[in-house]
Amino acid sequence: VFKMVDGNGKYHAVRCFHREKKGRGKNYKLICEALAKVSSPYLLPVKYLGKELYVDSEEYPVLLMDWAEGMTLDKYLRKIIDDEHALWNLISNFRQLSIWLLSQPFAHGDLKPDNIIVKNDGSLVLVDYDGMFVPAMHGQIARELGSQDFRNPLRTESGFDKDIDNFPIISILLSLELLIANKDYLSQFG
């Protein structure tokens, strides 16, 4: 992922794909269409540009989304681990994100600390929509299963629906709450 600035001074994240993956274009179009109808501070506008990058006469797709300024959840945790008030605020913000996400007809599909950005004001935003499920994908198999450390160990490719975020939400929330009880868990297990 590259950070770039447009002519208006706005920052974007640009993800370049150097290999063709079957169904990627179709699925990203479905994701972009679904997310275009959602107004939420937890999501970033995203566009899939099918033939945007030219290398040696080959055309490659790119993904363009707004840049989320902040720190990944894991880096932010290491920064605030000694500040119980900041940790409680983070837990509260993650609960709110979780309640919102669980009420949606879609799922992120790869919830993990690296895909949650803590913005400078403490609010949270999700990034990396590769594994996302949207209703138009009903009946498809998962393109990816999410990170092993944060997915349901029983999850399979056929388990691809709006409920795939349930397990990682519980896992992350419990982990955050355990840090209130013992901040040393972060250095021991984190």
What are these regions (language model features)?
Residues V1-L44, D56:
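ATP-binding glycine-rich loop module of kinase domains
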Residues Y42-W88, G139:
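Conserved structural core of kinase catalytic domains
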Residues D128-F133:
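Activation of the activation-loop gatekeeper triad in protein kinase-fold domains
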Residues L178-G190:
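Helical subdomain adjoining the active site within ATP-dependent kinase catalytic cores
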